[in-house]
């Protein structure tokens, strides 16, 4: 047990949580990393690396592991939550009794609340109350590249100006990690959820063998869907041309480090949903996000035809090629109508 102060407590010891913890520690900050599985944390402590996901990224001396949640949270007022979206609310409930009175919460989770499709800010407010400062980071980041110290840029949005400035100072590294602040709290959250869905579609297109033209069309029209939904929810449309929108969308739609894209490729090649998920071996956020994003769009009367067809493939057993033909056969329209 170690209660020495830390600049940040990172909750979630998967690939991305570990990569962010390493990045913070390399910036010279004291960081404590906690995960839900004590055996996993003990193994990380023994190996001084995350051998399962990031075997080549050694832990800096300023990164310590913690199996006791209360101790991890007592060490820092600033808490970075990096867990799958479907357990986000449950994890916040777990954290709540142990948070310091001056705690501030930031998350790197991309997605919406399971079943309800609510933005994660609404979940956080419900669990933690209105007073606690909140923030979100999002953008084109693969954990392996981040942990390797390769150049990366993200967007940061917060409900609190001081928290935003403090986080930018903590995270920013002039050698490899650039952090752009953005006042659009809704837009930065939403981009990370919608891009997961479109990445599955881009993967399906490539799995079928449709080529670069089709993939690019899906990215472009997927961006239009993201922007339409964001605008309906009160986001700034320009956010979706930045790191949390177009940046993350292009990354996950074009590189096979993306689990969502690889999942889509397998579906396009004819594998079933369960088999494709098993082959990935990690959480495919876009699978749940598809249902949640579509439900959110329908509640707000927003047309999202690509998302609708991906939903049909994932949940209604529609063939991926048939879904593509449905999109191609839609009524002719002006590109600028409804974005």
UniProtKB/Swiss-Prot annotation:
Enzyme kind, highest EC tier: oxidoreductase
This protein's GO CC annotations: cytosol
EC number(s) recorded for this UniProt protein: 1.1.1.94
Location in or out of the cell: Cytoplasm
InterPro entries assigned: 6-PGluconate_DH-like_C_sf (IPR008927), 6PGD_dom2 (IPR013328), G3P_DH_NAD-dep (IPR006168), G3P_DH_NAD-dep_C (IPR006109), G3P_DH_NAD-dep_N (IPR011128), NAD(P)-bd_dom_sf (IPR036291)
Disulfide feature: none
UniProt function note: Catalyzes the reduction of the glycolytic intermediate dihydroxyacetone phosphate (DHAP) to sn-glycerol 3-phosphate (G3P), the key precursor for phospholipid synthesis.
Protein name per the record: Glycerol-3-phosphate dehydrogenase [NAD(P)+]
UniProt organism field: Yersinia pestis
Lineage, opening ranks: Bacteria, Pseudomonadati, Pseudomonadota, Gammaproteobacteria, Enterobacterales
